[in-house]
Amino acid sequence: MFATPLRQPTNASGARPAVSMDGQETPFQYEITDHGYGKDAVKVLHVSRKGPVHTIQEFEVGTHLKLYSKKDYYQGNNSDIVATDSQKNTVYLLAKKYGIESPEKFALMLGQHFLNKYSHVEEAHVHVETYPWQRVCQEETKSVNNQGQGSCNNFTSIDNRSLHNHAFIFTPTALHYCDVVIRRTDPKQTVITGIKGLRVLKTTQSSFVNFVNDEFRSLPDQYDRIFSTVVDCSWEYSDTETVNFSRAWQTVKNIILRNFAGDPQVGVSSPSVQHTLYLSEKQVLDVIPQVSVISMTMPNKHYFNFDTKPFQKIVPGDNNEVFIPVDKPHGTIYAQLARKNISSHL
């Protein structure tokens, strides 16, 4: 947020107290233009124990509130403050009372609770990060006595795989997070979901040619190169009533992987990071009508050929097998794609 210009004293004799936007007299010629407080990094694990098959959700939650009053800042008056420790307790109590279905629905419930419970709260912002637990999976392979190794009673067979009923493995492929903002003066709830840290690499079918050729250029045309990136992506929903948040997150992830990798046997050509990014964003808007705008960043993680020319006596010929990973510096490509005539908070 840009700072507002400093206000000048009203007369030459000195400054008089200013009046803030909520009508409260402030002690100096300055005013608080943004404020809020909350509890961050509240870790919660919820276990659903419906029969022998258990389901878990582990979150890291942040809750921030904005009050109508600023008297806690100006006067040191804490009478309107909902303590951050109370906000922490609210996370656990609502998880116990209502359970957890998805990070977005839990964040919506938390935000709405703060506005319903405390009339002096103007805005609630809830941030949730999901810990990626998946069920332990055991393939249905035949043992010496021709018995499937996944025949234990603690496993449920799905698609020739045995999924454990109550054991899980941490699989940090990508982070699922969301931000929910609920304002008392705005009937529309802001729900933003994201993917963070989706690292991918392919060894062929990526090129970069015919770019600007001038006196500053040293990079040759690259007709076939390693393409690696770490995708960060976020999108905002225009409709939160009809969307399945968990399914939508998985759909976006699958779309990104499909446009990056293509068919498992054939692959797909990537003439630039920009084009791959755009195709992914476009397909998300095509497939999920509740998404109004999507933003994506793809840093270009470089892998350069190790130069074997000085070592022809040891390894004669060209090298297309050994590469040097170079994290810094790296290119960064990003774009935001939106439906026409919409406003967003991305």
UniProtKB/Swiss-Prot annotation:
Gene3D superfamilies per record: Urate Oxidase (3.10.270.10)
Oxidoreductase as UniProt keyword: yes
Main location, first listed in the record: other
Domain of life: Eukaryota
UniProt keywords, alphabetically: Oxidoreductase, Peroxisome, Purine metabolism
A Gene Ontology biological process term: urate catabolic process
Enzyme class, UniProt record, top EC level: oxidoreductase
Localization, UniProt: Peroxisome
Annotated binding of urate, by residue: 84-85, 208, 225, 273-274, 300
Active site: residue positions: 39 (charge relay system), 84 (charge relay system), 302 (charge relay system)
Reactions catalysed according to its record: urate + O2 + H2O = 5-hydroxyisourate + H2O2
InterPro entries associated with the record: Uricase (IPR002042), Uricase_CS (IPR019842)
GO MF, any single term: urate oxidase activity
Entry keyword RNA-binding: no
Any GO CC annotation of this UniProt entry: peroxisome
The protein's annotated pathway: Purine metabolism; urate degradation; (S)-allantoin from urate: step 1/3
Tissue: Malpighian tubules.
Record region (Disordered): 1-23
Intervals of motif Microbody targeting signal: 344-346
NCBIfam families per record: urate_oxi (TIGR03383)
Recorded family membership: Belongs to the uricase family.
Function: Catalyzes the oxidation of uric acid to 5-hydroxyisourate, which is further processed to form (S)-allantoin.
Protein name (database record): Uricase
Organism this protein belongs to: Drosophila pseudoobscura pseudoobscura
